[in-house]
């Protein structure tokens, strides 16, 4: 079962990302890697105290845009800086595809109870898309820039 899932999903997922990165790189273009996940509202019987987590390693280009956007426009939200998890993990999607290729990146975590219903899903999809759309022509995001990883 494990080997089947690795071959059917994990390998296909990572190979497609690598294929797209290489396609763009061959044209001297660089991507920004944006990974979106959700996290449970409780961990070890404790309520998690953040709404959205911004995870990053050592490239601050995209995280800075998101932190500034939320600070300016959505002070009611509790934003975690490398919470509820660390963005400094070797061999995750960000490390493997963005950090190792010098691509700007961010991993966004949304608390699951906020996106259970369609209205929450639509709200957070629009919310997360706004800083990206505002910065779609920001050339600094689409340049290769190698930052040494802080991943352990």
What is the predicted role of each segment?
Residues 1-3, 59-63, 143:
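Short, structured coil/loop segments at alpha-helix boundaries
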Residues 1-15:
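Active-site-proximal, glycine-rich beta->alpha crossover segments in alpha/beta enzymes
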């Amino acid at each position: 079962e494990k080997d089947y899932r690795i071959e059917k999903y994990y390998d296909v997922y990572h190979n497609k990302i690598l294929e797209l990165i290489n396609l763009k790189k061959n044209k001297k273009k660089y991507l920004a890697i944006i990974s979106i996940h959700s996290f449970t509202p409780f961990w070890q019987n404790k309520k998690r105290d953040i709404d959205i987590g911004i995870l990053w390693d050592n490239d601050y280009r995209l995280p800075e845009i998101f932190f500034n956007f939320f600070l300016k426009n959505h002070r009611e939200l509790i934003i975690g800086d490398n919470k509820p998890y660390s963005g400094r993990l070797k061999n995750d999607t960000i490390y493997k595809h963005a950090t190792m290729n010098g691509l700007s990146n961010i991993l966004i975590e949304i608390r699951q109870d906020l996106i259970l219903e369609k209205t929450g899903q639509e709200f957070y999809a629009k919310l997360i898309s706004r800083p990206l759309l505002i910065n779609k022509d920001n050339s600094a995001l689409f340049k290769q820039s190698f930052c040494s990883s802080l991943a352990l």
